[in-house]
Amino acid sequence: MFSHKGKTRTEKHNLGIASLLSFVAGLVNVVGFFSVQKLTTNVTGHFAYFVDEAFKQDFRSAFHVALYIFFFFLGAFISNFIVEIYSRRRENLIYVVPTITEAVILAGIGVTGTYLISKNPDLIAFSLLFAMGMQNSLVTSISNAVVRTTHLTGLFTDMGIEFSQLFFYKDQKHKKKLIKSIKLRLIIIWLFFAGGVSGGIFYTHFGIRTLLFGSLILLLGLLYDFVKIRILLLRRKL
């Protein structure tokens, strides 16, 4: 699911990566909010706060909020920058490096977060926004913009459009394609919710260390992909 791109990518691959990453995003969203009371998987709310602070001419606070937006953007930029570099050198590592980077960030905050909450909570928010920017950019690139996992606004918009199209498109081939797309979006929404609920439950017991669980899920996803590809290559040789 991490290794296929373009014409070799199937709906099954998109479903696999959407399930994995949307669960992690939901978990990060809740853990980030519980720990530092900040939204860490999207920037829509932060932009509203930025405009509000700028309108009140509290430019220091406006700059502070703008940093949240910047770190999400920076994560998206760095993620695709890595993808472009490795696509020209080692294609087999195109998506591995950004995913490992995200896993390391989540693990790092999971380990140091208890200390940072009291000393520098903004560093937690910046790091998680950066990681989620990386994830959203990565999954958008992998799936050719079919899948986005870190926020739900676009998902509900696309799903609303597709539901309305069901009433007008009578062609069975097109209708089948719409239904598959709607199912994919419903799964992403459900697993984002499941990740959030899991994050909330684990947070009551483990606090910000819950992010270690998110990091582990990403690494297990990479391991599964690696083992599956090796098995397929081995079968071809036999």
List each language-model region with its residue ranges:
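Alpha-helical transmembrane segments of multi-pass membrane proteins
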Residues: F2-L238
